[in-house]
Design a protein with these regions (language model features):
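Helix-boundary and loop/linker segments of multi-pass membrane transporters
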Residues: 40-47, 103-109
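Hydrophobic alpha-helical transmembrane segments of multi-pass membrane transport proteins
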Residues: 5-6, 31-32, 52-67, 93-142, ...
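Hydrophobic/aromatic residues within transmembrane alpha-helices
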Residues: 9-11, 15, 71, 80, ...
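Juxtamembrane helix-loop-helix junctions in multi-pass membrane proteins
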Residues: 63-88
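Hydrophobic residues within alpha-helical transmembrane segments
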Residues: 20-25, 52, 56, 83-90, ...
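Cytoplasmic-side transmembrane-helix entry/capping segments in multi-pass membrane proteins
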Residues: 15-27, 75-84, 139
Length: 190
């Protein structure tokens, strides 16, 4: 939703009625899965400081994704990713130095190295590379809707790994998300 808003605000991409309907359907599907189709859960939400940070992260990601489509400089996807990683390391360096000054040390062992390798390779590098590539091919608006697939994949992983039961609300939410994605991929821009 926020990616479409910032694309509209910055005049980066035009949207269409199908995309708006698709976002509504898929967002409703996400809410169905997260709340287990229980309106009481939605009505009794309590917020804390961490939720505010998540809102900041959501806005940052939406602005990044919208502006990614607009980038006019001549960098390959790999070079652009390297630039983002370098900037991130520069911003994180002061926090790392403070931790060292306070006496915190990493306990490096094989499970730590394996976990760190996984996090660096897949969520850290591959996901960003494919996100940049996807936006360059189909645009920010159409790419953003695919973020709504996360609850579907989380459900599937919970079923496979933790033996969670597949419930009716999982099916309804997944169908709404899929309908939303299909809708958002149709139609001409207005």
């Amino acid at each position: 939703v926020m990616i479409i808003f910032f694309c509209w605000l910055f005049k980066i991409e035009k949207t269409n009625v199908y995309q708006i309907l698709g976002v509504i359907f898929s967002l409703f599907g996400v809410v169905v899965i997260i709340t287990k189709a229980d309106l009481g859960i939605l009505l009794n939400l309590n917020f804390n400081k961490g939720d505010l940070w998540m809102v900041v992260a959501m806005f940052s990601w939406a602005i990044y994704s919208a502006l990614l489509r607009k980038k006019k400089f001549d960098l390959s996807h790999i070079s652009f990713l390297q630039t983002i990683i370098t900037a991130g390391l520069i911003f994180l360096l002061p926090a790392y130095l403070i931790e060292i000054a306070l006496g915190y040390r990493l306990n490096i062992h094989i499970p730590f190295i394996l976990t760190l390798s996984y996090v660096v390779l897949f969520p850290g590098l591959a996901s960003f590379f494919f996100w940049i590539k996807g936006i360059s091919i189909i645009g920010s608006n159409r790419s953003g809707i695919f973020l709504h697939m996360m609850p579907i994949f989380s459900t599937l992983m919970a079923i496979l790994i933790f033996k969670e039961k597949f419930m009716t609300y999982h099916f309804i939410g997944a169908m709404l998300i899929i309908v939303g994605i299909v809708l958002s991929s149709k139609g001409r821009r207005v």
